[in-house]
Regions:
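Edge beta-strands of extracellular beta-sandwich domains
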Residues: 66-77
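Short alpha-beta junction capping motif
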Residues: 85-135, 213-216, 220-222, 243
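Short, charged low-complexity linker/loop segments at the C-terminal edge of domains
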Residues: 78-82, 248-256
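Solvent-exposed, conformationally flexible loop/turn segments
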Residues: 33-39
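Short amphipathic C-terminal alpha-helix that caps PH/PH-like domains
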Residues: 235-247
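Residues that act as N-cap/strand-start positions at coil-to-secondary-structure junctions
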Residues: 66, 94, 204-206
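Beta-strand-rich binding/interaction modules
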Residues: 1-30, 41-44, 54-63
Length: 267
């Protein structure tokens, strides 16, 4: 968008980790860069075989002394097995068998299928990866109704899913397959692992992930649908792995106690 094309521009790229270590880099042949959009500088090809842990990488592109960068997330295709993973009961329903097993001491991961959350607990709230336009009061409750997420990046449930305290593009998939749970109607003592930020006009306490004790058992409730098209959702697979690893650890020790009847209100 300058006054004329750039002649013989020096262009290149680097791929680095969050510590500043350069994993790969390259340069493109000098060329004329036209004014405007929709032209190609070159291709980026970077083997990722050296990346063995889930992490955020930064792709930086330079044109002469000007730079821009983008976050990308890399997850291993082969993960360390979770001991006794089969002891985690993963379900999308709360039938009598599941509830009885939970009360007797089972560990349950309740992943709500998108659209199954009861209206009373947030089923009519439409999450969007992008924020609302202006506010819902001025747009007749036009979707989306929320403003991203808030979480503690150091929470052990997210140890295998690198994140900052706010949403970035690794959360796009989860937020596109989820519902916002109005957890205060279950218990004001719940402290969500991942909180959904509501529109300031309604300001409801909303959760994407939370945990609780029910009887002698422990439950992690996910507003994220971990059922649909999982073969096409690498971010969802990685987040699910992180949650299961947490649930199989001593760190999974919910403080909030809920009754059977309270949990049943979710569906």
């Amino acid at each position: 968008y300058g006054s004329s094309p750039r002649q013989n521009a020096t262009t290149g790229w680097t791929l680095r980790d969050t510590e500043g270590n350069i994993l790969q880099s390259g340069q493109w042949n000098s060329k004329e860069i036209p004014v405007g959009n929709n032209f190609t500088l070159g291709e980026v090809a970077a083997p990722l075989t050296t990346v063995t842990t889930p992490q955020r990488l930064i792709l930086e592109v330079s044109v002469n002394n000007r730079k821009n960068d983008w976050n990308i997330w890399v997850y291993p295709t082969v993960r360390q097995a979770i001991p006794h993973e089969n002891k985690i009961c993963m379900t999308d329903r709360l039938d009598t068998i599941t509830l009885n097993t939970l009360e007797k001491g089972a560990t349950v991961l309740l992943s709500l299928k998108k659209g199954s959350l009861s209206k009373e607990l947030g089923g009519d709230i439409q999450i969007g990866f992008s924020s609302i336009f202006w506010n819902t009061a001025w747009t007749a409750k036009q979707a989306p109704h929320t403003l991203g997420i808030l979480c503690n990046p150091a929470h052990p449930a997210l140890s295998e899913f690198p994140t900052e305290y706010h949403s970035d593009y690794q959360w796009w998939d989860a937020m596109s397959h989820s519902g916002a749970i109005e957890f205060s109607k279950l218990s004001p003592k719940i402290h969500p692992i991942v909180r959904v930020i509501d529109d300031w006009f309604t300001n409801r306490p909303l959760a994407l992930l939370f945990e609780a004790r029910v009887g002698k058992g422990k439950i992690l409730v996910s507003g994220i649908d971990f059922w649909q098209d999982m073969d096409k959702r690498p971010e969802a697979r990685q987040l699910l792995y992180s949650l299961k690893k947490y649930m199989n650890s001593p760190a999974f020790h919910p403080d909030t106690e809920l009754k059977r009847e309270q949990i049943q209100q979710l569906l």
